[in-house]
Every structure is written in C-alpha cells, then in structure tokens.
C-alpha cells in the first residue's frame, strides 16, 4: 500500500471559499466526501485528513497559511510522514488553462503561481505531480484580482461536473500511474455539452 500526500492549494476562510484560487481546496473537499473521510484535523499548519482509497493510503492537506506560504505546511507533512517529492500530488488553479479543463504534469516551474513558488522554495524543487485546474484568464483587468474573485454563476453551474471529473482523474492516477492518466485526461473538457 503506497502512501501519497495530496495537497489542495487555496486560502483559508469563508471570504475565499468560492474563489478561483481555491480550486485546490474545492477538489480536496470533494475527494474527502467521496472517500468518506474529512479534512478537519488541525495539523501541519493546515487542515488534514487521511483514508484509504483504491488500495493506497491518502493523506489530504489544505494548508491554512495563505497561498504564498503553502510550502511550510507541505514541508511539515512530508517530513513527518517521511515522504519524498515523488509521493506528493498538488492540486491548484491555473490561469493558462480554460475553465473546465485540467492538465497534469510532473515537475516544472511555478509559472508565477505563488503557492507553487512557496512549495518549490520550501521543498527544494518542483519534482512533484501537479493537477492544474483551469480557471481561464480575465478578458481585462488584473490576474490577481481575478483569481481572488468568486467563480461566475455560469462557472459555479459547471463546478460539480468538473469536481467529479477531477476525482475520477485522481482515482485513475492512484490506480494506474501518471502516463496512463495523462493520456486519458490531459486537456479533457469536463463541462457537460451545452
């Protein structure tokens, strides 16, 4: 039974609950419901839970440090559980992917994402799997304001299908590994056809 740490990135508090930047938190909350566990224990400078799923032990973590300090929480959890970067899956929002689409990758830079920047600084590199949740770019205005704004009503209507799709993707990743999951899910549109 493999142990994996899955971190959903976001900002704590009700003010940020439905913002685009909290896509990682939303996926982790949905995954925990599917697994029949909760992410409510205060540990590792975050909210933490664990359970078994598809034969693996999954450790779920939502850092409560605010986005730009997420790496501290991740480093604490990895050290405590004696895990390496290859055991880590990070779920985060991505401006360069349209809403409804998801991309997976292993390694790479932070692409200007402050949560990833913090993780890479604290962990000494970026050699972990990322599940990048597309939130799209604003037509006009500041990207920082955009990711800290709530999803639009049209996006909110598509969130359940997107969250279900990402949990299916995670199940495939846990069962069958990254190459197969990438071939099945990379850039897949999870939104229902209009």
Curated annotation (Swiss-Prot):
Residues carrying the site annotation Stabilizes the basic form of H active site to accept a proton: 93
Record key words, sorted: Cytoplasm, Hydrolase, RNA-binding, tRNA-binding
Pfam family membership, one: Pept_tRNA_hydro
Enzyme class: hydrolase
Covalent S-S links between cysteines: none
GO molecular function, one term: peptidyl-tRNA hydrolase activity
Record flagged with keyword Hydrolase: yes
GO cellular component, one term: cytoplasm
Enzyme Commission number(s): 3.1.1.29
Database matches in Gene3D superfamilies: Peptidyl-tRNA hydrolase
Compartment(s) where it occurs, according to its Swiss-Prot or TrEMBL record: Cytoplasm
Any GO BP: rescue of stalled ribosome
Catalysed reactions, semicolon-separated: an N-acyl-L-alpha-aminoacyl-tRNA + H2O = an N-acyl-L-amino acid + a tRNA + H(+)
Residues that hold tRNA according to the record: 16, 66, 68, 114
Active-site residues, as the UniProt record annotates them: 21 (proton acceptor)
Feature type site, description Discriminates between blocked and unblocked aminoacyl-tRNA: 11
This protein's record includes keyword Ribonucleoprotein: no
HAMAP family to which the protein is assigned, alphabetical: Pept_tRNA_hydro_bact (MF_00083)
Family per similarity comment: Belongs to the PTH family.
Protein name: Peptidyl-tRNA hydrolase
Species in which this protein is naturally found: Geobacter metallireducens (strain ATCC 53774 / DSM 7210 / GS-15)
Phylogenetic classification of the source organism: Bacteria, Pseudomonadati, Thermodesulfobacteriota, Desulfuromonadia, Geobacterales
Protein's gene: pth
């Amino acid at each position: 039974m493999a142990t994996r740490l899955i971190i959903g990135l976001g900002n704590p508090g009700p003010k940020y609950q439905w913002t685009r930047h909290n896509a990682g938190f939303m996926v982790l909350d949905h995954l925990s419901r599917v697994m029949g566990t909760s992410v409510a224990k205060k540990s590792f400078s975050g909210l933490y839970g664990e359970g078994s799923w598809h034969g693996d032990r999954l450790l779920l973590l939502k850092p409560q440090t605010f986005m730009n300090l997420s790496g501290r929480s991740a480093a604490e959890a990895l050290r405590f559980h004696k895990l390496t970067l290859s055991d880590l899956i990070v779920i985060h929002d991505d401006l360069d992917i349209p809403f409804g689409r998801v991309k997976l990758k292993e390694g790479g830079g932070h692409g200007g994402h402050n949560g990833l920047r913090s993780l890479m600084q604290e962990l000494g590199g970026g050699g972990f799997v990322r599940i990048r949740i597309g939130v799209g770019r604003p037509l006009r205005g500041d990207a920082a304001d955009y990711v800290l704004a709530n999803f639009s009503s049209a996006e909110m209507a598509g969130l359940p299908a997107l969250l279900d799709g990402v949990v299916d993707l995670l199940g495939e990743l846990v069962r069958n590994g990254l190459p197969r999951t990438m071939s099945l899910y990379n850039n897949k549109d999870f939104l229902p056809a209009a």
